[in-house]
């Protein structure tokens, strides 16, 4: 029996989908008593799982398949003209890696981001407890990539370093710096970092065609979508 075959999973009861409110969602979770092994995590990422806090999960909906796992094949990616402009616009940004931690600097930025960009979502209102539970986990593969200009914190990309790629868990950034397109820049930086580390992919989570907040991911080409248990490349 393989390691994955020994794993246990639990499905939630149907609940209102946070992305498509007209739909009922069911979520499949890895047994929380299972240690968060980085190789198991990597293997499950290839099967469409994501991390939130201490949990690995995947949509398991009976009547909907709108959430499509997406990843960028690093060696094939070429930035388009707009993405090159974003890279040039942020040439003054310095990025450094930090261990996950709670600081007032992080939380102040997170709070402004949620209040100004996601006040209509289920993460509003932001709280210190929510921030810590969601993002500040003591996991050896988790990183806070800090994006700074002259020591001013502009963005944090919470990223998991896996054997097969980088998993972009969550990014929050300065909402007043709209011209920089910091969310897009963070993804472009993670692609470059994955290439530097000779990793295969950047896992972006779920692409949802009819959800404006989630359909931007296909702007990065080529992109691979997990369809019928097979990664399909879109150019």
From Swiss-Prot:
EC annotation from Swiss-Prot or TrEMBL: 2.3.2.29
GO terms of biological process kind: ubiquitin-dependent protein catabolic process via the N-end rule pathway
GO molecular-function terms, A-Z: arginyl-tRNA--protein transferase activity; leucyl-tRNA--protein transferase activity
InterPro entries xrefs: Acyl_CoA_acyltransferase, Asp_Glu_LeuTrfase, N-end_Aminoacyl_Trfase, N-end_Aminoacyl_Trfase_C, N-end_Aminoacyl_Trfase_N
Primary location class: cytoplasm
Enzyme class: transferase
GO cellular component annotations of the record: cytoplasm
Keyword field: Acyltransferase, Cytoplasm, Transferase
Subcellular location: Cytoplasm
Catalytic activity: N-terminal L-glutamyl-[protein] + L-leucyl-tRNA(Leu) = N-terminal L-leucyl-L-glutamyl-[protein] + tRNA(Leu) + H(+); N-terminal L-aspartyl-[protein] + L-leucyl-tRNA(Leu) = N-terminal L-leucyl-L-aspartyl-[protein] + tRNA(Leu) + H(+)
Function: Functions in the N-end rule pathway of protein degradation where it conjugates Leu from its aminoacyl-tRNA to the N-termini of proteins containing an N-terminal aspartate or glutamate.
Family statement drawn from the similarity comment of this UniProt entry: Belongs to the R-transferase family. Bpt subfamily.
PANTHER family: ARGININE-TRNA-PROTEIN TRANSFERASE 1, ARGINYL-TRNA--PROTEIN TRANSFERASE 1
Protein name: Aspartate/glutamate leucyltransferase
């Amino acid at each position: 029996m393989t390691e994955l075959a020994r794993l246990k999973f639990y499905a939630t009861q149907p609940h209102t989908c946070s992305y498509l409110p007209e739909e009922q969602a069911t979520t499949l979770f890895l047994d929380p008593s299972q240690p968060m092994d980085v190789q198991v995590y990597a293997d499950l990422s290839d099967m469409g799982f994501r991390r939130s806090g201490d949990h690995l999960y995947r949509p398991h909906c009976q009547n909907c398949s709108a959430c499509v796992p997406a990843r960028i094949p690093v060696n094939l990616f070429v930035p388009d003209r707009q993405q090159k402009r974003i890279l040039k616009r942020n040439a003054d940004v310095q990025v450094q890696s930090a261990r996950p931690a709670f600081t007032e600097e992080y939380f102040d930025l997170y709070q402004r981001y949620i209040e100004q960009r996601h006040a209509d979502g289920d993460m509003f209102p932001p709280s210190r407890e929510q921030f810590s539970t969601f993002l500040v986990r003591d996991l050896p593969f988790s990183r806070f990539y800090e994006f700074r200009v002259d020591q001013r914190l502009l963005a944090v990309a919470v990223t998991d370093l896996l054997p097969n790629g980088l998993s972009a868990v969550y990014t929050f950034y300065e909402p007043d710096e709209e011209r920089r397109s910091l969310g897009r820049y963070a993804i472009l930086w993670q692609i470059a970092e994955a290439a530097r580390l000779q990793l295969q992919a950047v896992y972006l989570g779920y692409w949802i065609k009819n959800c404006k907040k989630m359909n931007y991911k296909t702007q990065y080409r080529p992109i691979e979508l997990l369809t019928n248990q097979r990664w399909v490349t879109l150019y």
